[in-house]
């Protein structure tokens, strides 16, 4: 699960742990209130004014305000993996969710301990959910791999795809040997 999807995946795991062989989270929401999060300031490690000034501003706004890596390759990944969801997004529904998008209970309080393979990837320059709050998840996931990628923001898989691909491949390999709880 990515971002809010990370909170939803944790909820599914808490409700049905016997049906889950493992969990991978990229920049998961931990604190539902933005004001309570420990977040980084937005930093662009690889600025590219030639690219960002030449793009339609309505398409590039989120890329510019969230992207740490603003290379042509990162823009292509953003177009392929992020923009389609943004285009299909129901803005009114998102506004309602943003006002209260948390679940009734903290998933980890319901879950307790989960010993399956877990991957948590965060970006050190993530100004949306940060990387510090996710460390509070670790006592609940004793077999977790926790990685904070430098030069990566909220879209760590866009900013540092090779690192994320390697981590996910390792997690998938662990999944092959993980019995269902």
PLM region spans:
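Flexible "cap/lid" loop of the alpha/beta hydrolase fold
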Residues: 10, 14-53
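Residue-level signal for the nucleotide or nucleotide-sugar donor/cofactor binding architecture
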Residues: 89, 129, 159
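Conserved serine/cysteine hydrolase catalytic core
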Residues: 92-139, 148
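Short aromatic-enriched loop/helix-cap "lid" or pocket-rim segments at secondary-structure transitions
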Residues: 34-39, 132-133, 159-161
């Amino acid at each position: 699960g990515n971002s809010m999807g990370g909170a939803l995946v944790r909820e599914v795991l808490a409700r049905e742990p016997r049906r889950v062989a493992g969990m991978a989270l990229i920049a998961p929401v931990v604190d539902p209130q933005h004001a309570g999060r420990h977040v980084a300031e937005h930093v662009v490690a690889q600025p590219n004014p030639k690219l960002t000034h030449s793009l339609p501003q309505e398409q590039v706004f989120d890329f510019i305000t969230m992207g740490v890596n603003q290379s042509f390759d990162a823009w292509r990944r953003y177009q392929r993996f992020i923009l389609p969801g943004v285009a299909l997004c129901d803005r009114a529904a998102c506004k309602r969710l943003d006002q209260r998008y948390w679940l009734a209970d903290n998933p980890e309080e319901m879950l307790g301990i989960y010993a399956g393979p877990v991957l948590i990837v965060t970006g050190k320059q993530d100004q949306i959910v940060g990387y510090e709050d996710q460390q509070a998840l670790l006592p609940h996931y004793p077999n977790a791999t926790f990685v904070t990628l430098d030069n990566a923001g909220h879209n760590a898989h866009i900013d540092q795809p090779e690192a994320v691909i390697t981590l996910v491949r390792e997690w998938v390999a662990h999944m092959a040997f993980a019995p269902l709880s």
